[in-house]
Amino acid sequence: MKRKLFIDTGHSAKYQGANGEVEWVRKIAEKLYPLLDTTYWDVVKVPDVYPGENSASTSLIKRIRWINDNGDANDMLVSIHANSAANVNARGVETCYYSGSDKSKEEALR
């Protein structure tokens, strides 16, 4: 059985994150989908609009709830962001994982 790979574009249209972030990450996601190996993964796009969304944290909670309702512990989430920083020289990648699971850490380190 294939694992699900949830792709989330980070913010909703209502709560867009950094200036221009929502448009940028959607373009990245659209370029990413055809590159993913569907031999091992069922690729699932996470919806970005939920009824009753009234804050960025509500949006995140509803996204996580949707993913949990549509997946299981063997699945993976990639949430794409284009964060900003006060320091114009800041560069890099950030990976977050569930610290209560050695398996999550192993996956994040791959």
Language-model segments: which ranges?
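Active-site-proximal helix/loop segments of hydrolytic enzymes
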Residues: 2-5, 13-15, 23-110
